[in-house]
Amino acid sequence: MDSINIMEKFSLFNEQWTPKIIGELNGQYVKICKLKDAFVWHSHENEDELFMVFKGTLLMDFRDGRTVRVSEGEVLIVPKGVEHRPHTNGEIVFNLLFEPKSTLHTGNVEIPLTVKKLNWI
């Protein structure tokens, strides 16, 4: 059992929208990912999704027309079943996620960016 330097882990990869696992607890993975520009509209039928921004500003669009701004040090929890689309204003955002191990980052949508086997770093 060792501490994890999250910012150091972010320095180990450049891919965007490709979560990396840095830990697990209680049937969930602790994941980090870099986000830039717009992702796909999607939802997670059985899982809530927690976004915690370490660097930059994440914007989360919802189908009701709202956009929620998530700044450094802030958290947004998207309830299961709620369609959402994360995006940025062109900057690379460092994000941490807590999700059940079975959660696909693209939720109910399969696209070329869908990663079914996540890597540990």
Please give the residue ranges for each predicted region:
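Short, conserved beta-strand element in jelly-roll/cupin
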Residues: 34-35, 44-63
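A short glycine-rich, His/Asp/Glu-containing loop-to-beta-strand
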Residues: 6-41, 47, 107
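A cytosolic small-molecule/anion-sensing beta-strand core signal
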Residues: 26, 54-55, 71-72
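Short beta-strand His + acidic residue motifs that chelate non-heme Fe in jelly-roll/DSBH
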Residues: 41-42, 60-61, 78, 83-89, ...
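Short acidic/polar mixed-charge low-complexity motifs
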Residues: 28-29, 58, 66, 82
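Short acidic-glycine-tyrosine-enriched beta hairpin
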Residues: 64-80
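Short, surface-exposed charged micro-motifs
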Residues: 21, 50, 59, 67, ...
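Double-stranded beta-helix
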Residues: 2-10, 23, 85, 89-121
